């Protein structure tokens, strides 16, 4: 029995590898992060710059996109991300602005013309921000989103 050929439209590499690993993801996250403190919708959510935020978001995305599981193994995993968002009361306009600014960071990191990558990243960010909005507004554990582990995003 021979295996079916791979779909040539789907890259063989992980999204993490396609992004350039930690270096590429850090470029995206840094570009995004630099923009949020000037934004009137997002600045109230983020407050002031935190030295570890770029590292933590990079590690989260690396794991989500098929890279090493550092966020889970070293930084507290999904329970940590839930605790970070709890009580922030993120609104739908803030969620949408987060996605918009994140995708602008993707573009500034030289992925503006990479439509499959942009589509995959946007889908992951949309999904994650929808979870964040639920968790940030939950007043009890029963109101938290049912997602309890970092999702693994593929093409």
Regions from the PLM with identified roles:
Residues 2-13, 26-107, 111-114, 118-137, ...:
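Heme-based O2/NO sensor domains and their adjacent alpha-helical segments
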Residues 18-23:
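Short, solvent-exposed beta-strand/turn "edge" segments of beta-rich domains on protein surfaces
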Residues 133, 142-145, 151-154:
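Extracellular secretome segments
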